[in-house]
Amino acid sequence: MKIIVDMMGGDNAPLAVLEGAAAAVKEYDVRLIGVGDEALVRKTAADNNISLDGIELVNCTEAIEMCDEPARAIRTKKDSSIVVGLNMLKEGKGDAFVSAGSTGALHVGASLIVRTLRGIKRPALATMVPAKNKAYLLLDCGANVECRPEMLAAFAVMGSCYVNKVEGRTSPSVALANNGAEESKGTPMLKEAHQLLKTIPGIRFVGNIEPRDVPNGDVDVVVCDGFTGNVILKLTEGVAKMLLGMLKGMFLKNLGGKLAYLLLKDSVSDLKHQMDSEEYGGAPFLGAKQPVIKAHGSSKAKGIKNAIRQAKICVENDLCGTMQAALDELNTTKE
């Protein structure tokens, strides 16, 4: 198995990408193809005593910046690490692609270069979100701001396949994000989507879920349009950061708080670990013909390593093939 890694993507590239890639080679027994400025990558590796064993380097002369317009960048920056990496994936030179670079460019590139599964026009961006009982898969979380009911149905099918194959959960539950639990709630589009989701074979649709209940982690997959998903994701991140900050302030406020921290530090450490998004790797573009994983732009070595692990699991379990079979069944049912 070969996984292609964008060495230039993210706020901490190339050092964090190198550290994560080297750790993945040791821990997961994978071969990597690092795409980027080869001279810079080699110098960074040498300066930080990072082994390049198991990492083949492919030189690129360009990089897509976060400020670049995504579609234009994909068309014009042909020798950028994202475009070169996605083309290598399409040509079968690797089995999956991992990048912490521009989300927009990756979405456009996954659609136009790697192409999409039958029945999918644009991939959905999905991410595992920490929650009280268990992490849940949220999709779409930003790639498709407006969605039709048929798109949400496809998201539900792909999300169910992902949680089953990658997270190892049998018969995952699927819920539709809405402003009320009743079938009568929501916009006309959401009402239609609800009725459609009830008819899909092969998924366990449990109905609508209100935003206040999403953080409980009672369901495995939460389906929504990209606008709603992005709001849920960023609000969750903000609240988590706020709560951890308040907790820290409480412990540091006085001697009693400091003593309480000494008694509870293991529990606090467990909580921080549970809420750490880097533990879950990256966000897959579900619907692309081959696995494309978007690591967080601020990913450190652990986040990159886990995104590579995530890509490896997708390949080993033939996630894209499984999703295509499920989508074909969905389209046959609709006909």
Model-derived segments and spans:
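Glycine-rich phosphate/nucleotide-binding loop
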Residues: 111-124, 128-138, 218-222, 226-335
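Short, glycine-rich nucleotide/cofactor-binding loops
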Residues: 5-14, 143-153, 294-301
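Short beta-strand segments
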Residues: 6, 34-36, 58, 99-101, ...
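Glycine-rich phosphate/diphosphate-binding loop of Rossmann-like nucleotide-binding domains
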Residues: 15-16, 31-33, 39-42, 145-207, ...
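N-terminal phosphate-binding or glycine-rich loops at protein starts, especially the Walker A/P-loop
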Residues: 1-42
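Short glycine/serine/threonine-rich phosphate/pyrophosphate-binding segments
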Residues: 13-17, 79-92, 96-110, 117, ...
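Phosphate/nucleotide-donor binding subsite
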Residues: 50-94
